[in-house]
Amino acid sequence: MMSRQLVFIGAGMFTVSMAWMSATESTILSAIRTSPEARATYLAHAIIWRDPGALSPKDVLEGPVGAFPYTYEQANSDEGIECTFAQAGKELGGSSAKFLCRTADGHDLRLKYWDPQSRTGNREVFGTVAASRLMWALGFDAVPALPIKVRCDGCPENPHTGAGSRRTRRYVAMLQAQWPTPVILSNGRVDQGWSWRDLDTAIRLLPRGLERARQRTYFNALTLLGVFMQHGDRKREQQRLYCAAHVDTEAGELRADNVVTPPLILLERPGASACPTSAVTIVDVGATFGGAGRESSEATAKMNLEAWERKRVFTATNGNECRGELTVSFRALLDGESNPVISEEGRRFLVEQLHRVTQEEVRAIFRAAHVDQLGPRGPDGSPEAGRAIDTWVAVFQDKVRQIEARRCQPAE
């Protein structure tokens, strides 16, 4: 999978020192720029699912090997990772609580954070880890995320705004990798992304045959997984189309572009094909394991056990038509495909993949996500990790049973 061989670049969610980058930056393409028609073809044929191979509970807990400069054990030790406050989150873009912290060895860590004392902060800290771990374990592509305990020196009382007195503060945080490159674009926006309707339509326009049937099955399984996780924040910039193989630079013209990092793109010639294997990934799965909704509310759409438990997997319909129960955000609109239709082939395929994930692996997912921070506290005020994990696992397994019990109409 992409996540097992990820190359990091020096911009975005995870930034590293220029010394680290200097050896590789000049040879990494940021993007392939092509025509809308060629991009639609890349999208139709893109890898949606790959067999993740055999994973143990320990593998699931630790996450993709080599994706980060720290192991799970290092990042989640009692001491955690020490860094110095570098920049307020409001200066980094976006509205969710975050900040930039610099380590002694020069790593700039862009962190979404949660204050375990006040139990406030960014709930995407938990949702991103849980969702990306689950997708990876099932064979679907998502940008990896590392749970991390941080000791921030010189941290203001509010690290997102930069306001308040400064002292050493401890947070439960999440470090996310940059998305894979080169992305495949048909315009000048590196975050062009793709919508669920785009991918749905591209597959529908494939010639009848084995490839279209396979792509439809994988797409419907991924769609159903999104319903399962209540991933409603499905605007197009949350997804990427990228080249998952060696790029043929002879198929176009290399050009410098200072808007992107690394500053190098390939302008694909008409009729040429620079990428032999395209793939799709989801780059933001933070608003998951809640109740979704038009606003992607911090309180209910992101890692909220009660809201997630209340959501059934399927809507009530007549006959065998299956529609997932999912309200997408306003920004996704029609392109996000609310209450999506699920085929029997897609349902069955997802069930098969879910059966490969053992209960201990599910426990590892929620342990990695630090759901204990959201659960009940013991008499001494400390989180009751085992009890919290048990509750999340029980709801997870109930949703699996809902999918197992349903029968849907076959794809066209």
Give the positions of each predicted feature.
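Hydrophobic alpha-helical targeting segments used for export or membrane insertion
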Residues: 8, 12-18
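Cysteine-centric signal of extracytoplasmic or virion-exposed proteins
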Residues: 83, 101, 152-155, 243, ...
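Conserved ATP-binding subdomain of kinase catalytic cores across diverse folds
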Residues: 75-191
